[in-house]
Amino acid sequence: MMILDRRVHIDLAAGKPLRIDLGSGGAGRGDYYGIDFVDLPGVAIQADLNEPLASLPDNSVGALRSSHCLEHISGFIALMKEVHRIVMPGGQIEITVPHFSNPYGYSDPTHVRFFGLYTFNYFVETSRQPARKVPTFYTDTRFDVGSIHISLMKRTLVNKVLYPTLRKNLNSSFVTQERWERTLCWSAPADEITYGMTPVK
């Protein structure tokens, strides 16, 4: 792991909470420091996300986001443990990944996992999980999942017909999301799913 942008060192020395973008590529998104494996323009920290984020101290991050990155990470549970370590109590986490119903997700040979409605509930205390309970014994890392938003693919014929109705109702509650994932997701597939979370410490 190598910090390329001196402003990261300055903010850390001043105790200013960082805002980081995991797997940013060269996008350079606003006031977020980009972290990526490749030293591209806009990347502030070069790191292999399958390795510990050793240069970032505990509780040094106030906001973390990641878009279409985690599906490429083989050490997913270990990375989430690192995310938990570096994000401060009350820090905001936003993760966007392809939903498992996205047919294009299976074509990419660099994708090593798929995500659904319940994926991050494996990091949530059983008593705080909605609906179907999932095991939590794989890790002691805990998060609260405050929001989940499913974005439908607009390119399919079924979605073009159903999209206006589904868009209004799909994300109105976890119950409607679960019903869609259980019964409709293969007919009306999603493009991506976004989770809003905070670490539990």
Spans of features found by a protein language model:
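Class I SAM-dependent methyltransferase Rossmann-like catalytic core
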Residues: 1-9
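Conserved SAM-binding loop
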Residues: 8-101
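S-adenosyl-L-methionine-dependent methyltransferase catalytic module, highlighting the catalytic core
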Residues: 77-78, 88, 92-201
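Residue-level marker of positions within ordered structural domains that often coincide
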Residues: 1, 27, 125
